[in-house]
């Protein structure tokens, strides 16, 4: 396989593709990961940007397009939301109000618009969003088919560190793997990908195209993505934002805690690193640390069977009589209401 660079698109991101040659005897899927920044606190403008990027990817023949974690709604990098042990500041509460206002309801008008985009450009779409459920927010991935249907969602089950003060915890009811004409598609978000039991649950559902929207641009992230591809015998598509300080509101409205004085408008605060990896652990496209980009590869689905001949983690390489996993895949609510179907009426005597 040879990495074939495509000339840069005017006023658009770099695009790269993998040439699979003419000898593949199995179906191929052209997949694109989007590396781009949210327009922070401006969800309508971010949706416009998402459509532009989706249209560009589709023009290159993409059948599946994966966006980064929290692309709609934004990843509040560097913010503390005014929190310390035993104290929340008024400024931090106002910051949360604005962040809450930038989130989207699922279902809701923004979901309908994303579905229409997927149908318009005839692509399967995996989109990272901040979901608003009343006054609780979730870091969520939405799935859409190429006919413009909303398939469902995955809520991040374990936010990391300070994310836990702004995002709720997903439960086992939203760990889907969708059987599509392109293959079986699912997603885990950022450091969820370091949770062996969650990965095992997805492998057990037969995942073939493993999407990993993230906010981690460190070099070590690539090792995790390669490991998952080898462990699961699946394609791994990791999409991250590429952000500069100027992509966030300026101070004092938005402050990168502890580092603001060291930043210029052009300082890189998230360097991307989006990548596509094959089931054999080969890097098909990326990682890109240069700027906003569309990163694409043609996925030879025959690679999955070839990889699983060596190692099938929930098949011939499993030992269920020694090691097994229980997944509670039902929704959990803090409040349950029960009532009788009818109330007996007493007759006056």
From Swiss-Prot:
It catalyses: a nitrile + 2 H2O = a carboxylate + NH4(+); 3-cyano-L-alanine + 2 H2O = L-aspartate + NH4(+); L-asparagine = 3-cyano-L-alanine + H2O. Keywords: Cell membrane, Hydrolase, Lyase, Membrane. It comes from Nicotiana tabacum. GO terms for cellular component: plasma membrane. Its EC number is 3.5.5.1, 3.5.5.4, 4.2.1.65. This is Bifunctional nitrilase/nitrile hydratase NIT4A. GO terms for biological process: detoxification of nitrogen compound. Belongs to the carbon-nitrogen hydrolase superfamily. Nitrilase family. The active site is at residues 69, 156, 190. Expressed in roots, stems, cotyledons, leaves and flowers. The keyword Cell membrane applies. Its main location: membrane. It is a peripheral membrane protein. Gene3D superfamilies: Carbon-nitrogen hydrolase (3.60.110.10). Highly specific for beta-cyano-L-alanine (Ala(CN)). Low activity with 3-phenylpropionitrile (PPN). Not associated with auxin production but may be involved in cyanide detoxification. InterPro entries: C-N_Hydrolase, C-N_Hydrolase_sf, Nitrilase/CN_hydratase_CS, Nitrilases_CHs. Induction: Not induced by abscisic acid or by 1-aminocyclopropane-1-carboxylic acid (ACC).
